[in-house]
């Protein structure tokens, strides 16, 4: 979402279950509408109200990192909400959409567009060169501060139940996000849309 205002005059609705992350988001983007609820259910109930939808369903049960630690973590089914949202948007949503997630430890059930360490499912073309070499040096000692500095976000006042390193690592590269929105907006502009409502 960061830097999207540079692309177009947009109205954004952000949906986040974590109340304290929602607070941080609202402080950063006071003009956005922030809803504290389950994004998966909200998508089903409100998808038709938007022109563009970006969804990033929870990734831990899909990630290669978790599977690599399978000797020390409990087994868990992959969360199929990811594929529910892809199929739902593909068949029901009339606007442009992006569903983003990490590379899984298995062959994806629905072929994605692979860009760097992320997979994207979209109904429009996205740039091929979204990998940002700056982000490859973030992990390790002091990674939270490096991610936060790159994304210009402050997690120091976060008091919720998630680990800050997990939050920082889950931030989608804002440069990639902006370029994807530019791609969608360019296509939508050609379709004579004057203003976007974004989810």
Language model regions located:
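SAM cofactor-binding core of SAM-dependent methyltransferases
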Residues: 1-44, 54
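Class I S-adenosyl-L-methionine
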Residues: 42-52, 59-199
């Amino acid at each position: 979402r960061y830097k999207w205002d540079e692309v177009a005059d947009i109205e954004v609705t952000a949906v986040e279950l974590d109340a304290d992350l929602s607070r941080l988001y609202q402080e950063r983007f006071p003009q956005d509408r922030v809803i504290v609820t389950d994004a998966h259910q909200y998508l089903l109930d409100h998808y038709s109200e938007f022109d563009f939808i970006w969804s990033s369903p929870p990734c831990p049960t899909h990630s290669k990192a978790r599977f690599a630690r399978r000797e020390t973590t409990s087994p868990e089914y992959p969360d199929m909400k990811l594929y529910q949202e892809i199929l739902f948007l593909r068949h029901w949503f009339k606007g442009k959409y992006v569903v983003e997630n990490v590379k899984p430890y298995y062959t994806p059930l629905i072929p994605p567009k692979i860009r760097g360490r992320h997979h994207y499912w979209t109904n429009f073309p996205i740039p091929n060169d979204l990998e940002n070499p700056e982000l490859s040096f973030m992990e390790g000692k002091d990674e939270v501060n490096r991610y936060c500095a790159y994304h210009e976000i402050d997690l120091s006042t976060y008091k919720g139940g998630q680990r800050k390193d997990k939050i920082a690592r889950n931030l989608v590269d804002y440069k990639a996000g902006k370029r994807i929105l530019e791609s969608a907006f360019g296509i939508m502009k050609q379709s004579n849309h004057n203003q976007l409502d974004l989810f």
